[in-house]
């Protein structure tokens, strides 16, 4: 998979939300994802990750070796000072 394919899948689920994707190693199989969405309100961190992993369940292991996920609500993101 490439960055555009990952963004396309995420945008289909997180419509009009903020999404950033980075190829962590430049190898096309390790990615860092930042998703800022109010769909995460009252959702645990584990469940946020599950939501995102479910979008890629057919690509994990075969095309994606690792995903680093940062998932925030809009309010949580506004409170971040180090990003």
Where are the model-predicted features located?
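N-proximal, solvent-exposed amphipathic alpha-helical segments enriched in charged/polar residues
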Residues: 1-17
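Short, non-transmembrane amphipathic alpha-helical segments
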Residues: 6-10, 46-60
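Short polar/acidic secondary-structure junctions
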Residues: 11, 24-26, 61
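Short edge beta-strands and adjacent turn/loop segments
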Residues: 16-32
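Short loop/turn motifs enriched for small/polar and acidic residues
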Residues: 24, 36, 70-74
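Histidine-centered active-site/metal-ligand motif
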Residues: 30, 49, 65
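A short interface-forming secondary-structure element
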Residues: 34-47
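C-terminal structural segments of small proteins and small subunits
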Residues: 54-83
């Amino acid at each position: 998979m490439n960055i555009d394919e990952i963004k396309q899948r995420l945008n289909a689920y997180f419509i009009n939300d903020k999404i950033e994707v980075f190829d962590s190693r430049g190898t096309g199989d390790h990615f860092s994802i930042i998703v800022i969405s109010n769909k995460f309100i009252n959702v645990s961190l584990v469940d946020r990750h599950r939501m995102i992993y479910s979008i890629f369940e057919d690509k994990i292991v075969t095309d994606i070796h690792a995903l680093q996920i940062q998932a925030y609500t809009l309010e949580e993101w506004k409170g971040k000072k180090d990003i």
